[in-house]
Amino acid sequence: MPEESIALVVDNGSGMVKSGLAGDDAPKCVFPSIIGIPKMPNIMVGMEQKECYVGDEAQNKRGILTLKYPIEHGIVTNWDDMEKIWRHTFFNELRVSPEEHPVLLTEAPLNPKTNREKMTQIMFESFDVPAMYVSIQAILSLYASGRTTGIVLDSGDGVTHTVPIYEGYVLPHAINRTDMAGRDLTYYMMKLFTERGYTFTTTAEREIVRDIKEKLCYIALDYDEELKKSEERTEEVEEMYELPDGNLITVGSERFRCPEALFNPSLIGRECPGLHITAYQSIMKCDIDIRKELYNNIVLSGGTTMYNYIGERLTNEMTSLAPPSMKIKVIAPPERKYSVWIGGSILSSLSTFQKMWITKEEYDESGPSIVHRKCF
């Protein structure tokens, strides 16, 4: 592996793939982790129609496609589709040849072991990379925030997890993972719209709802108070949204009722604890001496933490759970949507990291299981 070859950093999330070159301060390309298959046969001869579309192209042609997500809850469910996404990332988006660059991939904590092994296998056997590494998403977010101690609350499209890290050491016994995140909120939003009389059912319409959710939703500081306000003074909560066909729809109390499920998952019929409780439980599983520092460094990361007022609400909730004199500090970096990728970019450009890569020789010698020995 030549010294000067720059690493490629690929953060393959359940909803979006963020990729770029190590050392950059933002990902070069971000596109949805979507594969689109045409619903109808092609009758126009000479039209360059593909068997499948990836990412933005699938998003743009979604009206005639059936959309699939190859990654669900952080776990790859369809490896053929995943390979298409990686192929698209390397050759069409980054325009690099993977056999010339080491590749850093990311994954959620407490993922099935087979998931990493298969990732490693595809990278070495299908893309012939010289070296690769798999890192846990939350650790990278902490790197990006410039800390070595803190509890990272990372919520993306498929997985929400809280990971306590002390002086750079991850405390694996205290990691909490919930398979409830952005995509579940999108489905909940679709259900709330049905109650209002708007029906969104197809996979293409689900993407419209995701856009409404991202643009208009916010977290209520006091949910009951906000509900009362939305019933008494409706106009204060309502916003208009223009659909792709030009029609306008009104979005009202759904704006805060949808993301409320993060703090109260029973709203969508889930038995898991809310964000604030998982963070609290993670801290309580740690040694009593380090809890104070964790309470003081709660770092948010991931696209599902982008809602307005989430920092204030989390601070309030944590304050009511923590001991009375405890100082709570929630850090919500403005670039947190991409902080996992930024952390990966920092990590893979460190000179001390260069000896951590899994090389092609090591892979040929030990097979895919090498990934458990070399990557945390």
Curated annotation (Swiss-Prot):
From the UniProt record, give one GO term of the biological process aspect. exit from host cell
The protein's location, in the record's own words, is: Cytoplasm; Cytoplasm, Cytoskeleton
Q: What happens when the gene is disrupted?
A: Normal asexual blood stage development. Production of gametocytes is normal; however, following activation, gametocytes fail to egress from the host cell and to form beating flagella, while axoneme assembly and DNA replication proceed normally. In addition, redistribution of nuclear ACT1 into the cytoplasm fails. Severe reduction in the number of ookinetes produced; however, there is no oocyst formation. No defect in female gametocyte activation.
- Disulphide bonds annotated for this chain are none
What does the record give as EC number? 3.6.4.-
Amino acids binding ATP:
S14, G15, M16, K18, D157, G158, V159, K213, G303
Q: Which family does it belong to?
A: Belongs to the actin family.
More about this protein? ACT1 and ACT2 differ in their polymerization, filament stability and helical structure. Unlike mammalian actin, Apicomplexa actins do not form long and stable filaments.
Protein name as catalogued: Actin-2
Q: Which organism is it from?
A: Plasmodium berghei (strain Anka)
Task: Supply the gene name.
Answer: ACT2
